[in-house]
Each structure stands twice: as C-alpha cells, then as structure tokens.
C-alpha cells in the first residue's frame, strides 16, 4: 500500500492530489524484471565470467566478447520494455503542451550528451568493434578528464538518468521501470568507480576529489 502523487496541470493551474492505491502486481513485476536484467548484465561484465569464457572458448573469444555482450544486453532488455508496455498501467501525470516540447528537447539534449560522452572516449572499443577487427587491441589506458568529463565523472550515466526522468508522461509502469534503471545505473557507476581506481590509482583519486560523480556543480570548473 502507498500514496501516489497525481499532478493535474491544465489551463495554467496546477493541482496536487494524493490517491491511495494498492501496490499493483505489474509495478512489482517490472521492478523484478529490471533487477534480474541488471544482475545478469553485471555478472556477464565481471572479470570472472570473462576468464571463464577464455578458458572454455579459447583466447579468440575475448575479441568477440564485448560485441556479443552488448548485443545480448540490448536484446535481453526488450522483454523488460515489453512488460512495461503490455501490463495494466495507470497514468500518474502528463505534461501539457507547450511544456511537452521543452521536455522532449531536454531528452534530445540528454541523447546528444550521451553521444558526446561516447565520442570523447573510444566509441568503437566501447561497442566491441575494435577488438573484433583488430586482434590485440588493448583497453584505452588514458584517463579522460576533459569536455563533459570535466563536469562529471560519469556523463553517460548522467545522460541516461536525465533521459528517463524527463519523459513528458509518467505512468505507474514507467515509474517502476525508471526506478529499477536508476538503481541499476547507480550500482553500475559505483562498480565502475572501483574498476577505475584499480586502473588509474592516485590519478583517479585526485579526479574524484575535484569532479562530482553524476550531478555537475554550478559555476566555473577549474
């Protein structure tokens, strides 16, 4: 049981009401689906599973691992999206026109931010194409701290969070999906922090001290 806040925005007036609702099975199912997806995704990204892959399929499998991993991650997310689309749903709020255009414009900015962040690193390595086409290609060993990475340490995750929460319409199913994805993104960011600390050591510690993780500081960045 819980309280659902409902926003009604019409003709320039905003009214805030509270509706008492039972926790719907669809909400729980979607949350569980996202958590299962995130768990499998994280396990497959671990060094232990990569080592098992090399042992079972040989060193050549390492070249194709990231491409296969990315394809599996994309395809296995489709059933989660399907659940959110087909299960019984309930509207929480809808942003009216013309503010919908602002919401959509901010989502486009989030997508552009995601693209810029990828281009600042090594897009082809991230996708796994470089490893597949260039045997022996090594992981980028330069700590990127310029551009978007000067504002936040994980601009890709920031862009993802902005995109999902700036949707012009929110339903109960979408709320469950967004909450699950937010937890997944935050856990992923913390795991990546540990990896980067192992990789870059003191340089990354200094970077952590002067650059926020996900929420950029206002004002000039030194």
Predicted features by range, described:
Residues 33-46, 79, 107-129, 177-197:
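Transmembrane alpha-helical segments that form the membrane-embedded catalytic/substrate-channel core
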Residues 69-70, 100-112, 146-158:
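Membrane-interface loop-to-helix entry segments
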Residues 25-40, 138-222:
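Hydrophobic transmembrane alpha-helices
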């Amino acid at each position: 049981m819980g309280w659902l806040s409902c926003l009604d925005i019409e003709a320039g007036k905003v009214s805030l009401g509270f509706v008492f609702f039972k926790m719907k099975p669809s909400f729980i199912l979607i949350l569980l689906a996202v958590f299962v997806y995130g768990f499998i995704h994280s396990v497959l990204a671990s060094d232990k599973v990569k080592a098992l892959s090399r042992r079972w399929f040989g060193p050549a499998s390492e070249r194709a691992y990231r491409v296969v991993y990315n394809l599996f991650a994309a395809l296995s997310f489709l059933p989660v999206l399907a659940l959110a689309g087909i299960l019984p749903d309930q509207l929480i709020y809808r942003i009216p026109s013309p503010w919908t255009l602002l919401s959509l414009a901010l989502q486009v900015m989030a997508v552009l931010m995601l693209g810029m962040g990828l281009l600042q690193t090594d897009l082809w390595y991230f996708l796994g194409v470089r490893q597949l086409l260039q045997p022996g290609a090594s992981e980028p060993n330069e700590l990127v701290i310029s551009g978007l990475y000067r504002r936040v340490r994980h601009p890709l995750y920031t862009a993802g969070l902005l995109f999902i929460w700036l949707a012009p319409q929110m339903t109960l199913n979408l709320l469950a999906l967004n909450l699950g994805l937010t937890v997944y993104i935050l856990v992923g960011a913390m795991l990546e922090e540990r990896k980067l600390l192992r990789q870059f050591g003191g340089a990354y510690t200094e970077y952590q001290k002067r650059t926020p993780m996900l929420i950029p500081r206002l004002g000039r960045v030194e």
